[in-house]
């Protein structure tokens, strides 16, 4: 599939409002790709609107969008608890990324060139990954692990007897 991008300000407005509503309600939030960027913006961070040297992050014009990319999951993060700390090969296809990480968030993963590939809140279950665990051309185990963590975070606490 050739890659292309568009801007939809209304979709961004609605997405930011939904993210903020879930955060304010204390609900878990999992963002993938643009969702990760919007989590950062929601907390006051910024994004890189167009990565100049994109070759690590997506296919070129007319090529498949998603490529294999090696990222480093940082130890001591929620993402490391879910996926394991250290290097991880993921599917990537983006020309934008988190730039300045919002003060309430921390970096959870980085690409080899330093681009932020994961952000999270240190105490609330708010997590964003720039990569695409849902791409079935790559391993699906990271997707299953992320979804299991997300579902567990949203499950009601067991009642004490």
Where are these predicted regions, by residue range?
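Glycine-rich beta-to-alpha active-site loop
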Residues: 31, 36
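Conserved hydrophobic/aromatic beta-strand scaffold that supports enzyme active sites
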Residues: 70, 116-118, 128
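Anionic-ligand binding region
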Residues: 51-78
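Acyltransferase
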Residues: 129-161
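Flexible gly/pro-rich beta->alpha loop and the following alpha-helix that scaffold active-site loops
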Residues: 1-30, 43-44, 48, 52-53, ...
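Structured adenosyl-cofactor binding patch, chiefly the S-adenosyl-L-methionine
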Residues: 40
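Short glycine/proline- and charge-enriched loop/turn segments
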Residues: 1-3, 55, 60-62, 127-128
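Catalytic beta-strand/loop cores that center a nucleophilic Ser/Cys/Thr
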Residues: 76-122
């Amino acid at each position: 599939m050739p890659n292309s991008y568009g801007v939809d300000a209304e979709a961004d407005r609605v997405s930011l409002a939904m993210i903020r509503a879930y955060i304010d309600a204390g609900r878990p939030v999992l963002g993938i790709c643009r969702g990760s960027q919007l989590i950062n913006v929601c907390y006051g961070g910024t994004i890189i609107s167009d990565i100049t040297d994109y070759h690590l992050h997506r296919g070129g014009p007319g090529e498949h969008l998603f490529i294999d990319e090696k990222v480093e999951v940082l130890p001591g993060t929620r993402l490391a608890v879910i996926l394991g700390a250290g290097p991880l090969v993921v599917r990537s296809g983006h020309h934008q990324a988190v730039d300045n990480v919002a003060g309430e968030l921390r970096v959870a993963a980085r690409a080899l060139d330093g681009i932020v590939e994961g952000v999270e809140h240190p105490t609330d279950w708010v997590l964003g990954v720039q990569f695409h665990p849902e791409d079935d051309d790559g391993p699906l185990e990271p997707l299953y692990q992320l979804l299991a963590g997300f579902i567990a975070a949203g499950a009601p606490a067991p009642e004490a007897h």
